[in-house]
Design a protein with these regions (language model features):
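Aromatic-lined, polymer-binding surfaces characteristic
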Residues: 1-105
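Carbohydrate-active enzyme catalytic cores, enriched for enzymes
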Residues: 66-185
Length: 185
């Protein structure tokens, strides 16, 4: 009863004014509630919102538009959860939403790999902190279980990754890695 009441309230009070990760998580929660409680209105609101928010919030280089590697990991897990839901209830979610997830999740995994410290930890840009999002290893394991391939970077080979849309540049040489923010101030 409580979850139904909360979802009902949420369906009329989405955090559109905050946008970003707040609104995205609202849409995810409403989608799950809509599927579980077989509420077409909730599912429809959530799908419409996600179809708009995913391309808006995920840049072409795979970064979340808030430019925080920690929030990037959190929204990536949200996207994996939604994809997992689509696998469990294939007739309940649109092919359009599932296709969008299949398009963006690999880019997001690539960005997470590029931005991670050599020990797998999150890089501390913007308001990133340890211990908030699941670890890179856990996210990759989850993604692999859902059928997404992971291509780890070979840190022994020199490599420069220019994430032009987010402004982050990653350089790896002889096992050393430099990650810096070259975006406009």
């Amino acid at each position: 009863n409580s979850i139904f009441a909360q979802a009902s309230f949420l369906s009329n009070d989405l955090e559109k004014h905050l946008l970003g990760n707040h609104y995205f998580v609202n849409l995810k929660a409403l989608l799950f509630a809509g599927i579980i409680f077989e509420n077409i209105r909730w599912t429809s609101i959530a799908e419409r919102g996600l179809l708009t928010e995913i391309p808006e919030q995920i840049l072409d280089d795979g970064a979340n538009f808030e430019l925080s590697p920690m929030y990037h990991s959190l929204i990536l897990v949200d996207m994996l959860d939604i994809f997992n839901l689509s696998r469990c209830y294939p007739s309940k979610l649109s092919i359009k939403l599932t296709s969008l997830l299949e398009e963006y999740i690999p880019k997001m995994l690539t960005f997470m790999e590029a931005m991670a410290h050599p020990d797998g930890g999150v890089s501390f840009f913007n308001d990133s902190a340890d211990g908030i999002a699941p670890t890179k290893a856990k996210i990759e394991s989850y993604a692999e279980k859902l059928g997404f391939g992971i291509s780890p970077h070979d840190s022994s080979k020199p490599q420069i990754i220019d994430n032009a849309n987010s402004g982050y540049i990653c350089a790896t040489v002889a096992g050393n890695k430099l990650i810096f923010d070259a975006s406009p101030v």
